[in-house]
Amino acid sequence: MFSQYGVDTTRVYSCGFSAGGYMSHRLACESPRCYAAIASVAGTMSTAAYSACIPSRPVPVLQIHGTADAVVSYNGGVGGVGVDDVITKWTTIDICPATPYVVQLPNTNIFDASTVESSLYGPCSSNTEVKLLKVVGGGHQWPGTTALLGGLGTINRDINASGEIWSFFRNK
């Protein structure tokens, strides 16, 4: 398929929302040479995948997650690890600086009851980076979307997750 459609195999990415985010992390753990970078929105790692994750090379990772996510808890829960543990896992794998560059992003929409804090770990070994966009007060939602997933919390409108993901991927 790759040769038939002329796919640049050095620019294949994975991103996913919720269970798709879990999938992206697992793909990076199990097949790191297939992906230039991954992004996860509102999904972390299962405890089993977290324990088994020993990729053969560093992988750039973007994690976007709401602190008020009641479906996939920011702090982890039954069967899943918390966001901070996921970030620590990838910064260890990618051999990143221990201290991130932290920026509070502009609160451009004061009515969405949430803000975004960006933590960038990098540059890491092999010129990778790990980035966390912590949506303070954000729910189990895709930031920037106009479609509301009913009952799943606040949608942040200060960032557009799709744009943030492409911005992260495009130079990897």
Model-found features: residue ranges?
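Gly/Ser-rich "nucleophile elbow"/oxyanion-hole loop immediately N-terminal to the catalytic nucleophile
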Residues: 1-19, 29-34, 105-106
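Catalytic active-site module of serine/aspartate enzymes centered on a nucleophile-bearing elbow/loop
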Residues: 153-172
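Surface-exposed acidic, glycine-flexible loop patches that form ligand/cofactor-binding
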Residues: 1-10, 48-55, 122-124, 171-172
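Glycine-rich nucleophile elbow surrounding the catalytic serine of serine-hydrolase chemistry
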Residues: 17-26, 71
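Soluble non-cytosolic domains of exported or imported proteins
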Residues: 29, 77-84, 155-160
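Short, hydrophobic alpha-helix immediately C-terminal to the catalytic nucleophile
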Residues: 25-29, 166
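The feature captures the conserved acid-bearing segment of alpha/beta-hydrolase catalytic domains
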Residues: 36-126, 137
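Active-site-adjacent mobile loop/cap segments within catalytic or ligand-binding domains
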Residues: 132-148
